[in-house]
Amino acid sequence: QFIYETGDAAGQNMTTTCTWQACKWIMKAVRRFEGLRIKNFLIESNLSNDKKVTYQTFLKGRGIRVMAECLLTAESCEKILKVTPKLLVTAYQSFVMGSISAGMIGININVANIIGSMFTALGQDIACVHESSLAQLHIELTEDNCAYCTITLPSLVIGTVGGGTNLPQQRECLEMLGCAGPNNAHKLAEVIAGFCLALDISTLSAIAADHFARAHEKLGRNRPVNYLKMGDLDNNFFNLACHSLHPDA
């Protein structure tokens, strides 16, 4: 098995070329051994797990392995997510049972939504969304009634140099995040992991509070409603919004 460090590039093309050259050298080198011949050679046979979800990828990783975590207080859960920490953990446990019953590799709510959208905007390889969406979400109740949430992405195939990162709009999006160019791949991984954790918590909370289907039914594309217009964004709108979040301010 060939293992590479590709710096801030996703490095899929460079690793293919390097492996190919190494294998050609090996095939040439073994000719000097009498009776030893390589009958067949393929540059790829799926053992790399390229663009596939596998247990090997889950355990050993491909690309960058990154973890994000947060601690949600009871006040934050009830005020923002509209659930208690206990209800959030109970809902998560139901997802664990469902994931095991379905034979899933890893447990997450909807990481693919973040991976797909951010890969498109940031010039990443869209074909790698499948393996990069592999994730392990964990939520537990702490002794002081907080929800400790963590997510691990073991196979985030991303880069901040090369490939689609040089496209004008994608480059601009990377610059907005402060992740364009060399020495930024791990920073980008942290940003993506943070968004994945945030969306999983938000979606799980909506499901736990029975808001998920209701919101889709009310605001879905089949029922477009102009609830908010540009003209509504006046001082009064923002004053009311700020007051709802900070009533004592």
Description of each model-found segment:
Residues 4-166:
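Glycine-rich anion/phosphate-binding loop at the beta-strand->alpha-helix junction
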Residues 115, 248-249:
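Ligand-binding grooves and catalytic loops that recognize ribose/phosphate and carbohydrate rings
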